[in-house]
Amino acid sequence: MPERELWPAGPGLEPATRVGSCDSMMSTTSTRSGSSDSSYDFLSAEEKECLLFLEETIGSLDTEADSGLSTEKSEQATTPQVPRALPKTQPAPQGHPEEITGRVPEPKRVTPFSSAHPPGPQSLGLRSGSYSLPRNIHIGRNQNLRKSTTLTNSHNPGGSEGLVSGPETEQVSQSREPRQTLATPPDAALELDGALIPPPEAFRDTQPQQRGQGSLPRGPGELSPRPQVHPSLSSQRNREPAPEAMSQKASEKGSTGEPVPPRPPPLVSSRDAGSGDAAVLSGGHPSARPAPLTAPKPRKLPPNIVLKSSRSSFHSDPQNRLSRHSEAAPGDPSPASSSLQEQRKARREALEKLGLPQDQEEPSPRLSRPSVRLKETGVQAVSPAPAQVPGRAPAAAPTQGPSPGKAPALAQPPSPGKVLVPAQESTPGTAPAAKSTPIPIPKGPRAHSPLTQRKPDSGLTLQESGVPGLRQMSFKSNTLERSGIGLSSYLSAEKASSPQTSTSLEKGSFLDRISPSVLRNSRPRPASLGTGKDFEGIQVGKLADLEQEGGPKRLSFQGQSRDKLPRPPCVSVRISPKGVSDEHRREALKKLGLLKE
């Protein structure tokens, strides 16, 4: 073959001549001519034999793929598909910047790193003439690729475009693999080349179809911005299936004529062909399988997951949750009712764990009270639709509820609050909206308590009421502060309740004068520790005797125990100053309005 005898003037310069850049051809001739002849001297006899054998195999493959079409025709047919080269993608390694601009088969720059042709780059890695050897072999394979695509072009002009663009996508996925072969010996690299020739099933079946489908709407000029990095391995893979079969697959894909979005950027930096294959199959073409990939993503969470959130988030944003459920409710009433039952059960368990009042465990009789009240007071509102009456029941609850998130609604007078909130909540106005009424349950049971209407900002005033003894008997708690009987919450509750429970105006100043120790002695106890009535008999019996007997000894031991010996948490002790009898305490409680007889 003439290519074997004249390498510098052989196929290495034909693409440059056909593209029409004479400057790059002349520069290549001038730079390569001096060193390419002497580049054989650095090769051993085995390497030369390997190169000649590679050329013969390439020539035989060219004749097989040609099948009657000459090289000139194939070049003229395929060069319009890749008309413009990319000067930006790859830098010139040896300082020849003008060579890159004119040549279409860009991969000649990357050829020294190719695993298919290692002998030249290994022995002559630093010489500029070393690029000629693998470059020519590379061009032979590139020509083979072009001939196969022109054969398919005669059958199906639209499908051959996809076959040309197919190797380009594959080149990038394998561009990093050849750089590992710089350190391998030539024989091992040749064995690797032989091992890479048979393509996997995924490349043989799905890849040409997907690429032919992906490149159908593109014009020939749009293929130019794709960086051609390494076509040697891809040309080996695309050489295996028959061109007729590939063109038939491409024509089948082209006959569908689906509009496909443009291909994703081809920067699949996979090390081996298998992982690059998987990356292109899984993430590269979303248009191939649109339905299973995109369908599960916008799936919403089921309503019970949203409902089983913490108590603080429930209080902070009850309005959003109610509107969310009233949106989901009109479509399917039965899941709404089941989710409400699950919500009640979850709230009941959470309240038991937190030690909060358990009168919230029976929300339905509690909630029916304000709704009955509204039915009595707002008789004129019953006529439009019966579904609006349950819609107003949760509307009255936020206006009276003590939730911190409801502070702006509570700052308004009650009548505009009742007007504003139904405007938001009664808009569904259907019967399933009535099923979402028990959602603002934590605010409903407090509708009758006068303290919480006045003091919405303290979060612990939930548990306060006008009759503290009755209220605090109804729950068990692990700590004092969690159950809402902390000193600060007690003070704020007393200050808030003073205008209602007293007839004189000196009650507020009296509260300010009281020291915290007196308040600590007189405030109601949680149910787990018992109320004051439980300890009255003990006070008269054992503790009174201890006070009379102990005297100063007991006081000194008390001072020691406060500093050194911590009191066990399960024991509750009422500490009163010496000489203060129970009558004084009762009088103080009566003045405070806490003790009613």
UniProtKB/Swiss-Prot annotation:
Segments for region (Disordered):
1-40, 63-477, 492-585
Its cellular-component GO annotations read: cytoplasm
Domain of life here?
Eukaryota
Compositionally biased residues, Low complexity = 20-39, 328-339
User: Which residues are modified to Phosphoserine?
Assistant: 130, 132, 515
Q: Name one Pfam family in it.
A: SARG
- What keywords does the record list, in alphabetical order? Cytoplasm, Phosphoprotein, Receptor
What does the record list as coiled-coil region(s)? none
Which stretches are tagged as biased composition: Polar residues? 68-81, 141-157, 307-321, 492-506
Q: Where in the cell is it found?
A: Cytoplasm
Biased-composition ranges, Basic and acidic residues, are 96-109, 342-352
Family of this protein: Belongs to the SARG family.
The UniProt function text for this chain reads: Putative androgen-specific receptor.
Quote the protein name from its UniProt record: Specifically androgen-regulated gene protein
State the organism of origin: Bos taurus
